[in-house]
C-alpha cells in the first residue's frame, strides 16, 4: 500500500513477454519487478503498435504503477537502483534495504533512455 514494500512476493507474470494492462492491474498498488531478463520495458498499444520503450538495462528494480482510478489512463515505468521503503520499516534512508548512499566526495551517475 502507498507504494511501500509489504514483505510479500508474488509473480505478476512468469515466462512471458507480455503483461496485459487491465483496469484492475493496480488495484493493490504498484508492482516492483526484480530479476528481469530484458533490457527494455515497453508499453505497446495493441491496436496500432505505437509504443513507449524504456531501457532498464543496469537497473535491478523496475516499478510500474498508475493512478488508482478506473479506467486506466496512464502507466508509469520507473527503473530504480534501490527499493521503496517498507510498510513498517525504518524511515531513515541508510537503514532501508538496498539503500544507495555516497560518501563525501564520491560521485555516481546513470543513464535512462526512453523512446
Residue ranges and their predicted role:
Residues 100-115:
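Short Pro-Gly-centered flexible turn/kink motifs
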Residues 87-95:
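Short, structured beta-strand/loop micro-motifs enriched in basic residues and often containing a Trp
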Residues 1-57:
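Active-site/ligand-binding surface loops and adjacent short beta/alpha elements
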Residues 30, 43, 77, 112-114:
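Short beta-strand element of the conserved SAM-dependent methyltransferase core
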Residues 45-88:
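Glycine-rich active-site loops that engage anionic ligands at enzyme catalytic sites
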Residues 65-67, 98-103:
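Short proline/glycine-enriched turn/loop segments at secondary-structure junctions
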Residues 39-41, 75, 108-110:
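Hydrophobic residues positioned within well-ordered beta-strands of beta-sheet architectures
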Amino acid at each position: 500500500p502507498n507504494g511501500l514494500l509489504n514483505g510479500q512476493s508474488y509473480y505478476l507474470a512468469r515466462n512471458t513477454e507480455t503483461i496485459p494492462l487491465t483496469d484492475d492491474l493496480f488495484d493493490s498498488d504498484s508492482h516492483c519487478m526484480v530479476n528481469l531478463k530484458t533490457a527494455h520495458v515497453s508499453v505497446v498499444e495493441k491496436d496500432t503498435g505505437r509504443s513507449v520503450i524504456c531501457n532498464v538495462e543496469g537497473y535491478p528494480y523496475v516499478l510500474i504503477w498508475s493512478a488508482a482510478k478506473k479506467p486506466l489512463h496512464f502507466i508509469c515505468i520507473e527503473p530504480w537502483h534501490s527499493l521503496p521503503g517498507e510498510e513498517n520499516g525504518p524511515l531513515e534512508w541508510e537503514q532501508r534495504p538496498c539503500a544507495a548512499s555516497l560518501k563525501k566526495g564520491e560521485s555516481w551517475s546513470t543513464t535512462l533512455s526512453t523512446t
